Amino acid sequence: MMQGIGGDIQDSQLIREDNVTHSFCGLACVGWMYQKIKDSFFLILGTHTCAHFLQNALGMMIFAKPRFGIALIEEGDLAKNEPTLQEVVSEIKADHHPSVIFLLSSCTPEVMKVDFKGLADHLSTPETPVLFVPASGLVYNFTQAEDSILSALVPYCPQAPAGEKKVVFLGSVNDSTAADIRADAEELGIPVGGFLPESRFDKMPAIGPDTVLAPIQPYLSRVALKLSRERGSTVLHSLFPYGPDGSRVFWEDLAREFGITVDLREREAAAWEKIRKQTDKLKGKKVFLTADTMLELPLARFLRHAGADIMECSSAYIIKKFHAKELEALQGVRVVEQPNFHRQLEDIRRERPDLIVTSLMTANPFVGNGFVVKWSMEFMLMPIHSWSGVVSLANLFVAPLQRRSMLPAFDESVWLEGAMPSAEVHA
């Protein structure tokens, strides 16, 4: 159950180190954002590396005509002042008829100092806006590219009049989860203004000075701050709605913003009971979370309240005000921003956690050394929000533990034999 909600942020053992994140670049957000905004097209100005990444990561064949594409930078483009994309954009309009085109930056053109904002403005028309989205891996974690997309959409959200008090949920979720969240709000008597983003460009929610913004993803601090400053909206600072504990606090805090007092402790208890079999398997398990998705804080909080022992929770970026409630709920837990991965490796080898939640890039080496691993990317792609997502969330953690329990004893040599012949010679 809930513990530590009233403590100071300083009580969390918050440490900042100096490492880069072993994670995808922001282009990965295309995988879920193009499916969410159904009348959009995502155009990336990038290199062959970007093309290979998206082709492999998203598993799309070219004949499927997905609503994203890459304008390749070749050697000859390095001598040009600015890339020419007018023909590409005209082809996109003819083939896909999008209502909006998002122009995403990548590492190489950013190093070349391409004026993406000016390029997008030049390509934009009243009928089909072209919006610049900074998405390279030079600055942002891959989930923060969604933050950039939502920030680009702000000018296209209508102005809600003063006195119209409704909640707008910030964050991309599938249509089924959005319907569940809307139903949960309406059941509590909370008027809903919509979601940012909605599934169509012309359906973006009206936002004004009396709008309450409820972030449902922990990596959307910039768009929340932008709307607060530009529209005067109120940002809900609560736990994020992951797990029974987070869902209860989120909905109680949101209802309070509308002058509604609700007690959801019974519903929280029923949700914990619903996943008792899963939490029984998590109790006492040592879990280590490496930095990847920026979901790590709420995931660690859920695991802790489910009975797991959190050895370390690390995240690429931690924004103290935006993540305040999650940090309070993790007081006493070692929380690390921009962790040094080499130090983490030594800690993991020494402490031998029962479960490591980590990125796709580091998962296989951990498995090869005998550890049980959960891909952190999976939490991005599954419906794990609010009450309807409780079972899915718990199952994601339990599945690798159950799988390992059904396998024969791990033979490390099967993975490592011949991997480093030079090491064998000197052994």
From Swiss-Prot:
Cofactors (names): [4Fe-4S] cluster
Listed pathway(s): Porphyrin-containing compound metabolism; bacteriochlorophyll biosynthesis (light-independent)
Keyword set includes Chaperone: no
Binding locations of [4Fe-4S] cluster: 25, 50, 107
Cofactor details (free text): Binds 1 [4Fe-4S] cluster per heterodimer. The cluster is bound at the heterodimer interface by residues from both subunits.
Documented EC number(s): 1.3.7.7
Keywords carried by this UniProt record: 4Fe-4S, ATP-binding, Bacteriochlorophyll biosynthesis, Chlorophyll biosynthesis, Iron, Iron-sulfur, Metal-binding, Nucleotide-binding, Oxidoreductase, Photosynthesis
Keyword RNA-binding among UniProt keywords: no
Catalytic activity: chlorophyllide a + oxidized 2[4Fe-4S]-[ferredoxin] + 2 ADP + 2 phosphate = protochlorophyllide a + reduced 2[4Fe-4S]-[ferredoxin] + 2 ATP + 2 H2O
Gene Ontology molecular functions: 4 iron, 4 sulfur cluster binding; ATP binding; metal ion binding; oxidoreductase activity, acting on iron-sulfur proteins as donors; oxidoreductase activity, acting on the CH-CH group of donors, iron-sulfur protein as acceptor
Gene Ontology terms: biological process: light-independent bacteriochlorophyll biosynthetic process; photosynthesis, dark reaction
PANTHER family assigned: LIGHT-INDEPENDENT PROTOCHLOROPHYLLIDE REDUCTASE SUBUNIT N (PTHR39429:SF3)
Family: Belongs to the BchN/ChlN family.
Subunit text: Protochlorophyllide reductase is composed of three subunits; BchL, BchN and BchB. Forms a heterotetramer of two BchB and two BchN subunits.
Job description of the protein: Component of the dark-operative protochlorophyllide reductase (DPOR) that uses Mg-ATP and reduced ferredoxin to reduce ring D of protochlorophyllide (Pchlide) to form chlorophyllide a (Chlide). This reaction is light-independent. The NB-protein (BchN-BchB) is the catalytic component of the complex.
Name this protein carries in UniProt: Light-independent protochlorophyllide reductase subunit N
Organism: Chlorobium chlorochromatii (strain CaD3)
Lineage: Bacteria, Pseudomonadati, Chlorobiota, Chlorobiia, Chlorobiales
